């Protein structure tokens, strides 16, 4: 692990020793952070992609918005109750949320909450096997195109509990200067995200 990873882990240890990490549950979510690098463009003939000024950044669709975003994605596990970020992973923006979900789970929390993008039957079984309550929102599928009323209610209840993560992202972007990735490359993007998360946790601890 690099220096910043060690610093984050040490801060996490001190927060835990101070009794500030409650372990009631982990709230998982991700946010796209645009890069300040110029977007690559496509040539008119042959649709060949021009060289990107940041080869590690990637495109992704904006949820609930038109168009696309170009940059990185910060995936976090937030301790319910304290609001402290105790797990963080940074990836290119096109990495699906569920890919890194298991890295955001501590293993000793009472429950794991997230939207339906994180739900898989395998993850549900794995959480149950570890004695962790699965509070992952459900989504319709080909076998069940319309969710049962109890699952719709379940989703609404989980959505209310995990709404605090949106406040976390708003604080990181608006108050902690994480609205844009200012450096080129995944390693430096990870460093910027980690620095902001460390500052966020220290501010909550103060």
Question: Where are the regions a protein language model picked out?
Answer:
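Charge-patterned, long linear interaction tracts outside catalytic cores
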Residues: 187-189, 196-206
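Helix-centered, glycine/charged polyanion-binding patches within enzymatic domains
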Residues: 48, 110-111, 116-187, 191
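Polybasic low-complexity intrinsically disordered regions
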Residues: 1-133, 139, 195-200
